Structures are given as structure tokens and as C-alpha cells.
Design a protein with these regions (language model features):
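N-terminal basic/disordered segments at the start of proteins
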Residues: 1-37
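Alpha/propeptide regions of enzymes that mature by internal proteolysis
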Residues: 1-3, 30-113, 177-216
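N-proximal short alpha-helices
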Residues: 7-17, 66, 154-158, 162
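Short Gly/Ser/Thr- and Asp/Glu-enriched loop/turn motifs at secondary-structure junctions
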Residues: 17-19, 113-116
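General secondary-structure edge motif
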Residues: 21, 77, 81, 162-165, ...
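Conserved mixed alpha/beta catalytic, RNA-binding, or beta-rich assembly cores of soluble enzyme
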Residues: 114-215
Length: 216
């Protein structure tokens, strides 16, 4: 399947290719930004696939690709002989697409949302509002992020996410300096939420639950 692009309501761009699904918004030179986003997106999956065996191994040897290096840097603080760079893949992809947009186009505000892991670009008076909800979709309020805040990445991980989690948390959300850093931290926190030896928790090897996992 080839990379797909479509425009959504609210002047948003939808990009998809295999497991990668992005929702993108931009204020400013939007058309130029969207063209840059798609041009960069076209090769993302192939780049990651080329180094996937290494990225699924515990953090160690430095990968070559630009996105893979973002993943490696974000995962490095958590290197323990088990953790892999895949803990930061969604955030790193979002961050890379946003970087391509801001390099090409003058933007006051932009975001790239990769399945809930979000890379942000904010300047001047621009803000980004994050809605907070409970697992049963009860509205718990909002958080406004401004350009003066040291936050450019938001990520959520847990049992309800797209990837397997080693923990039992419904969701853990992290705000950080970059999307890849937020993704890595949220993944690790989600993995750490556990009740050892609880009789209502069933444990099994990850590869018996999903055959494409890197969790073993």
C-alpha cells in the first residue's frame, strides 16, 4: 500500500501508511506545510522498516536513520538491557514530520498527532488545548499549553493504547520537551504501573498476545 493523504474538516491533513496514522494541523503557510509533511511522510515507513530488527533490540548500537536516531536518543535514559527504541517510535515520527513542516513553511502554530502522541510547534500568542477525559469518557477539563511553556510533546500510553503495555494503567499521559521524549516516558510509566501477584491479573508472554510485538 502506498502512503495516503486526504483533507479533513477544520483544515486538517490526514496521512496514513501501514500502521502509521497522522492528523496534522497548521496555522500560517498551511499548504506549503502540508506538502512538506507528505513529502517527508512518503519514505518514513520504509526507513523504519529497514532498521526494524535493530530497533526491536534492547538499546545499544546506534541506528543510522534520522527518525531511528530520535528514537534511540529518547530511549537511551531508560536503557536497561531490555528496553528498546520502539518505546519512542510514535512520538519520533510525529516530531520528524513536524520538523519537515517548520523547516519549509512559516507557521505560528502546528501539531502532528500520531495516534495520540503529539508533536507541537507554538510561537507568539499561539496555544494548544488538551482535553482530559476518564476511561469512561467523562470530561475532566482541559489544559492550555502556550509558546512560553517548555512543552512540545504530549504522549499517552496504557492498556487502551494501540501497542501492548506491560502495566495495568488505563492511560498515562506525559508532557515533555519533545514528542519522542514524552512517548518514551509515557511508555515506561505505563509499563511500571502494576500489582504484583494480584489474583485478578493474568500474565502471558507478549508474543502470545500479539505476534508482531518487540516485548518478547
Amino acid at each position: 500500500m502506498m502512503p495516503q493523504a486526504s483533507l479533513l474538516s477544520g483544515d486538517r491533513l490526514h496521512l496514513s501508511h501501514g500502521p502509521i496514522d497522522l492528523i496534522i494541523g497548521a496555522d500560517g503557510a498551511r499548504n506549503a506545510a502540508f506538502r512538506a509533511a507528505f513529502a517527508r511522510f512518503e519514505t518514513v515507513l520504509d526507513e523504519l522498516t529497514a532498521e526494524l530488527p535493530l530497533l526491536r533490540q534492547p538499546v545499544g548500537n546506534r541506528p543510522k536513520g534520522k527518525i531511528a536516531r530520535r528514537m534511540y536518543r529518547a530511549a537511551l535514559p531508560y536503557a536497561d538491557g531490555v528496553t528498546t527504541p520502539m518505546i519512542a517510535v510514535a512520538g519520533a515520527v510525529a516530531q520528524e514530520i513536524l520538523a519537515a513542516m517548520t523547516k519549509t513553511a512559516e507557521l505560528t502554530r502546528a501539531y502532528v498527532n500520531n495516534g495520540g502522541d503529539i508533536a507541537l510547534h507554538l510561537t507568539g500568542a499561539a496555544t494548544f488545548r488538551v482535553a482530559i477525559a476518564s476511561p469512561d469518557n467523562q470530561n475532566l477539563g482541559t489544559v492550555d499549553i502556550s509558546s512560553t511553556d517548555a512543552i512540545r510533546g504530549i504522549a499517552t500510553s496504557g492498556q487502551r493504547g494501540r501497542s501492548l503495555s506491560l502495566g495495568i494503567a488505563d492511560a498515562v499521559t506525559v508532557l515533555a520537551r519533545s514528542a519522542s521524549m514524552a512517548d518514551a516516558a509515557a511508555t515506561q510509566l505505563g509499563n511500571a504501573v502494576d500489582l504484583h501477584d494480584h489474583p485478578h491479573i493474568t500474565r502471558a508472554p507478549a508474543n502470545t498476545v500479539r505476534d508482531d510485538t518487540d516485548l518478547g
